Amino acid sequence: CYQRGMRVVLVPTSLLAMVDASSGGKTGVNFLNFKNYIGLFKEAEEIFVCPDFLPTLPQAEMRNGYVEMLKHGLIADKSHYDAVKYHFLKSNHPLDPSLIFHSIAIKQQHVEQDFLDTGIRKRLNFGHTIGHALESHSLVIKEENESLSHGAAVGLGMVVESYISAQLAGLSEDDLQQITLVLQGLVNSMNEDIPSMDVLLPYLQKDKKNQSAEINFSLLKSIGHCEHNYTASVELIAEGLDFLRKLK
């Protein structure tokens, strides 16, 4: 990278950047319409998180961050999920800063154990296999300022991957329905059709998380408990997309 690596200090000003993008040391750029296809690992020297920036954000931008916070709860802490869910559904309610720092702590716990993303850190990818495919496709068919946001794409991905979790990882029907209900608003606000499996498959096959020719997922066993290194068939992924499509 430039000058063999530069020291960097980050001051995230969006909720998504505070709870996710600024920590963990991953950098990435989109390439040939694939999400984060080129990147490296480089930790910031310092990260200054100031929640006072948040009142300047539109609600759509806040929702992007809430989705990643919901994900942190879904994979590791049910009580955190329940607390964030309240704020996500009550968009005019001020966000408790302690929830921001707890989300950061959940991510850091995974990163510290597995900086290079070869094991437990993969659990942070819940929702992102489908989410990145949806986001990449949207970038192709839409102008950049009209394309599906990262938070919305990951939220939709979490619906599909929760369905897959119910088929492969033992997620209960009650948990699946609860997650779906919380994320229903994202589905309702989507201003484009859910792409077919044929359209999404090239993006899924190029996902950087894959091992050999298999499409790799991190899946929920229950709310607050996630495991990594599942693979799903094309047929099952298509079922998950149908499940999402029927919610619109």
PLM feature segments, named:
Residues V11-P12, F126, L219:
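A secondary-structure boundary/capping signal
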Residues S14, D52, G127, H137, ...:
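Anionic group-transfer/hydrolysis microenvironments
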Residues C1-L89:
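A glycine/threonine-rich phosphate-anchoring loop and its flanking beta-alpha core
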Residues A83-D198:
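Active-site segments that bind and position negatively charged phosphate/pyrophosphate groups
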Residues Q59, R63, D77-Y81, P97, ...:
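Alpha-helix initiation and N-capping motif
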Residues V67-M69, L171-K248:
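C-terminal charged capping/lid subdomain of soluble metabolic enzymes
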